């Protein structure tokens, strides 16, 4: 079963070698409503930490030319916050480790100044002037202001199983790990963005919360998820459902595997599991990403011995970000990492009966979180089958 909560996987993992070259982040995304117009607006908040063993008195920024010349790796807490839409932006606030209060064990809690993240709460603010954003390209961010005060209820989990278990974590077997403690999460509270007030409510937030950690990122980098779902069969909203797809090209003990995805659908209490690491399921996956002038499109087909899932997602480029990260070694190889929160599409679920796949439901999805990127040196990606 993948719907298995385990907050020990949300603990900070930067110990041993990962303290010297490693990152850990807690990601949160949700939809809010304009307090005046009621219009939906998606937001994200992330707490990203790296290389605590290399801490200095000030945040060490890996893209600063002086640090690159000195061979310094990044070391800091970065609070990343922003929005998607035609005014999409990402705002970064950096803290030196001496100014960070971290309870690394479960339940995790990380705090710096007025910024806080835990299993049940998010608070903070970021303010970047246009002049500062232009003068500091090493901040890798835009200009704007955002503050938030939220509670979090992580309702449905995606536990990837043995691949992120303690033995494989201790062995640092994978370059990048994933755990979604709240692939369906209920947020409540307020957000202020560039002077406008927004309200966040459990019924309309379509919230998500996960974390990644490791020594490097993946390429390609794929993520698709939504819990704003409507059955075409019944025309009813699926209020106890969520899908989540992620991965790319995992490395185990520095050896890259064929491009692979982890995918699940929690369908009104029933689990559809397409986790390639569960060998008994004999999962097969094909996926493609196509970039057009005005939109990007994902196609994913996953199949196991019991079922199949076909996912198609669209997102307008004008509503998306090219989201920025630097790796813990100081490199910045993801320079075209498309990231959005306004995706829409369909998911078809099939059950296998007497050797044939029978359509169980076709689901309309909106408010889809979506991501795709490849390292700069990779060949353009079209379609790969992973077995």
Roles of regions detected by a PLM:
Residues 1-387:
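Structured soluble/peripheral alpha/beta segments that form catalytic or ligand/cofactor-binding pockets
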């Amino acid at each position: 079963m993948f719907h298995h909560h385990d907050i020990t996987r949300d603990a900070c993992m930067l110990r041993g070698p990962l303290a010297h070259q490693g990152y850990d982040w807690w990601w949160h995304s949700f939809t809010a409503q304009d307090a005046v117009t009621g219009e939906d607006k998606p937001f994200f908040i992330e707490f990203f930490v790296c290389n605590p063993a290399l801490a200095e008195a000030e945040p060490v920024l890996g893209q600063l030319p002086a640090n690159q010349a000195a061979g310094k790796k990044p070391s800091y807490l970065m609070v990343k916050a922003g929005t998607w839409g035609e005014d999409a932006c990402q705002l970064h606030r950096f803290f030196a480790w001496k100014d960070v209060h971290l309870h690394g064990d479960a339940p995790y809690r990380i705090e710096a100044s007025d910024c806080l993240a835990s299993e049940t709460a998010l608070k903070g603010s970021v303010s970047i002037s246009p002049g500062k954003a232009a003068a500091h390209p090493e901040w890798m961010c835009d200009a704007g202001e955002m503050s938030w005060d939220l509670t979090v209820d992580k309702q449905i989990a995606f536990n990837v199983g043995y691949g992120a278990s303690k033995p494989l974590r201790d062995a640092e077997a994978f370059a990048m790990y994933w755990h979604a403690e709240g692939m369906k999460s209920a947020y409540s509270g307020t957000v202020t963005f560039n002077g406008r007030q927004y309200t966040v409510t459990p019924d309309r937030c379509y919230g998500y919360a996960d974390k990644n950690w490791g020594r490097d990122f993946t390429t390609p980098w794929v993520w698709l998820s939504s819990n704003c779902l409507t059955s075409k069969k019944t025309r009813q909203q699926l209020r106890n459902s969520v899908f989540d797809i992620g991965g790319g090209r995992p490395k185990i003990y520095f050896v890259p595997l064929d491009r692979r995805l982890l995918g699940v659908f929690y369908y009104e209490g029933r689990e559809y599991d397409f986790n390639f690491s569960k060998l008994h399921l004999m999962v097969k996956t094909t996926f493609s990403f196509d970039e057009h002038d005005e939109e990007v499109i994902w196609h994913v087909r996953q199949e196991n011995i019991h079922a199949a899932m076909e996912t198609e997602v669209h997102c307008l480029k004008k509503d998306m970000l090219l989201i920025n990260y630097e790796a813990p070694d100081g490199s910045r190889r993801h320079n075209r990492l498309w990231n959005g929160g306004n995706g829409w599409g369909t998911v078809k679920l099939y059950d296998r009966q007497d050797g044939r796949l029978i359509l169980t439901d076709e689901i309309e999805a909106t408010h889809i979180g979506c991501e795709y990127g490849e390292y700069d040196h990779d060949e353009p990606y079209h379609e790969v089958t992973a077995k």
